[in-house]
Every structure is written in C-alpha cells, then in structure tokens.
C-alpha cells in the first residue's frame, strides 16, 4: 500500500511464482502454560507413585510373616523412587524459577509480521518517491493511442 492507499501490483520474483512462507510459532504464553501443565502432571504422578509404594511397603511390613528378604527389597526400591522423585521435583522447580539459563540462551525468533510490514513500507516508499514505471504499452493505452 502506498501513502495514497493505492494498491501496488508488483510482479512476482524470478520464476514467475510468488510464494509467501510464514513461519507459525506458538505464543510464549501457550508454551508457558503447556510447560507448567506438564511439570504439574509430573509432580502429581511422582507423588501418586510415592503414595502407592508407601502403601505397599506398609502392607508388607505389617504382615511379618514368612518373608524375610522381600520387605528389604521393597525398601530399597522405595528409597530409589524417593530419590528419583525428589530429583525430578528439584529439577522441575529449578527450571521454573530461573536456576538455569537454558531458555535465555535460545535465540529470539524473528517477528515475521514486523519484518513484513517494514518491507511493505519500504516498497511503498520506493513507489511513492520514484514513481512506478509502467511498460510502454500500458502508457500508450492510457494516453489513448
């Protein structure tokens, strides 16, 4: 669009076909919400697993029957699971509150809309300043010859 709101009819690039490719990017708020949801689900799954293993450990400890080695094996797995859940929780919370800068190191994606509007402005200014060159045939048609 030029300053006088006249539509510019620009020829396509070399090859005769104009292709407009727009990179679709998920908004930052959407990414943040999905990340928070995934982290919450991971913590809830870990807490649920801890609850189930604790219940199994309590039921095997209360039996005090013929098993002598089994409760010890369950307790080892329970300690490993506790360690895994605590590590997962610390890792998730550390990433949320800026403990690591792996998100800051990611390059900011270009704003396609701003770049396109800037390009349109440049094209419009070029047309307004220099005028549009029409082929000789169109100039002659406009004059009526």
From Swiss-Prot:
Keywords: Host cytoplasm. It comes from the Viruses. InterPro entries: L1-like. Coiled coil: none annotated. GO terms for cellular component: host cell perinuclear region of cytoplasm. It is found in: Host cytoplasm, Host perinuclear region. Belongs to the adenoviridae leader protein family. Very stable protein with a low turnover rate. This is I-leader protein. It comes from Human adenovirus C serotype 5.
